[in-house]
Structure formats: C-alpha cells, structure tokens
Curated annotation (Swiss-Prot):
InterPro entries: Ig-like_dom (IPR007110), Ig-like_dom_sf (IPR036179), Ig-like_fold (IPR013783), Ig/MHC_CS (IPR003006), Ig_C1-set (IPR003597), Immune_Resp_Modulators (IPR050380). Keywords: Disulfide bond, Glycoprotein, Immunoglobulin domain, Repeat. The keyword Phosphoprotein does not apply. It comes from the Eukaryota. Glycans are attached at N180. Residues 6-98, 121-220, 229-325 form the Ig-like domain. One of its GO terms (molecular function) is immunoglobulin receptor binding. It comes from Mus musculus. Pfam families: C1-set. Disulfide bonds join C27-C82, C144-C204, C250-C308. This is Ig gamma-2A chain C region, A allele.
Amino acid sequence: AKTTAPSVYPLAPVCGDTTGSSVTLGCLVKGYFPEPVTLTWNSGSLSSGVHTFPAVLQSDLYTLSSSVTVTSSTWPSQSITCNVAHPASSTKVDKKIEPRGPTIKPCPPCKCPAPNLLGGPSVFIFPPKIKDVLMISLSPIVTCVVVDVSEDDPDVQISWFVNNVEVHTAQTQTHREDYNSTLRVVSALPIQHQDWMSGKEFKCKVNNKDLPAPIERTISKPKGSVRAPQVYVLPPPEEEMTKKQVTLTCMVTDFMPEDIYVEWTNNGKTELNYKNTEPVLDSDGSYFMYSKLRVEKKNWVERNSYSCSVVHEGLHNHHTTKSFSRTPGK
C-alpha cells in the first residue's frame, strides 16, 4: 500500500445536552497508511479523561479514534482542538470541536446519553498477538470489542465469520466501565494459525438496540513482502561497568513486515526487566528495533548466559535466539 494521508473528523455530541456535568467529544482519524499517527488534545495540554483506541487496519488503510470527557462548563465555552500528525505523509491537522447548530441548548424530548459518543456503541476488532500466531504451541485469538454499551440496553449480539462462513467458537464477556458507567463487551475467537497466515478474513457482526443497523468489522493479515530480521547482541559498554546494573542490548534490523516479538532469557529462564522499542520504518522500507535488558553487574561478571529470542514470520521455524555471556578477563 502507498503512503496515504489521513482524513480527520471532529465529533461533537449528537444533541447539545449540557444539563449533565460532563460532555464527551471525539476525533476520528480515517484512511491513512502507514502507521503511526499521533493524536493529542489541545497540543497535549488536555490529557485527563482521554481514551484513545488502537488503530484498526481495514482495506489496507488504518483508522484510529479518540474521545475526551470534559466538564460542561469547559466546552463549548473554551476551545478544544484535536491535533493529528502523520509523519509518513508529512501531514499535520488541527480540528476544533464545534457545537452542532448555532447554539448549545437542551433539546427535549431528545435525550442525549452523556457517555455515548455518537449516540451508541462503537466496535473495534484486533488481530492476534504475533507470538501466538507464529508459535505452534500457542493459541491465536482475534478479538472484537464493543464499547459505550448502555446499561439500559446491555444485550449485545456478536456473530463471527471466517471467509463469510459463520463460526460459533467465540467466548464473550461483559465488563463494567467505572469511569463512565457504560459496559464493554469483549468477544474472543480462537483461530487456526494457518487461517491467519494464509490471509483469511475474520469478521465480527454486532447488534444492539442502540444501533440503527448491525456494525461489521473485518480484519486479515496484511499483504506485503517478508524479510527475515538480522539479530545482533551487544554487551554493556565499558563506561557502564562502574555501576551496579548494566545494560545488554539486542538490535533487530532489516525485517518485514513490522510484526515481531522479542524477549530475553537467562540460563533458559525468562527475564522480565527488559524494554522494547516499537518497530521503526527504515529508509529502505524495512523495519528495525532495539531491546534492552537491565541486569545486576555481578550476574554479568559471573558469566551468566543471556539470550535474545526473536519471533518473526521470515525466520526459519519463525524463531531465532542469539546468546552471549561475558568473556573471561573482560
């Protein structure tokens, strides 16, 4: 897919009900490629009450949405702006959230539910974790999440389809969101590894009384080139050896697509004290990333064996491990 700039839509409440103590505003960023975009409210000065959902890929383009809940005394009397930046297309867009209609007045008999952005539930679909897809011993899951479900109409029907054939193996749970007294419904569909890798399409269809028509969301593995990563492990720099803790680095370069999983082990046991960067797009269209592991210097000096494990679809058996330990005398 080619680089595509996003369209940005400000979302104001369906009706101007300011009788409640709070109001929810939204911002929809649609039709962009590739990731990422950054979205802030009032250039980052407004961060409380913000709920930004992960980007969803559909028809080779991404869509992302964010909502912010503020007091009725804040908006519309004060300006609230959604700021969107898409580095890949050098796009920067600022959209001010304007009231619908010339004035903000209560609009009886219409009742505008305060927690419901756009007057009803929203639906998002998420891919399986890459490690679950590529490791045959694990179980990949596609997830459909329905948010802003009213407690007055909690009954949500979710149907699943694989290549338009209905399946009935999903498990669905409902959770209450304390921050705005709505319900969140999560439906998890276990899938076959090969179904995802071969590009089959997964669709969830959601119905609820608050929806004028069922909402459908689809997802599949993005098409594109595959290139195996190069993995390099780097010992702590000499300047760091005066400290109690030292840093081991795993550099992973030249891979496509960006979906990758990296973890550390010490003598075969999983390490927890590591941090990974997000994959970064390189100038040739491939991706690179870093992972750093903080360890006690004495463990490194005692020549413990540390390993950086990488899971990616371009690798033989989808997995590789690079191990190293301190060389005696250093």
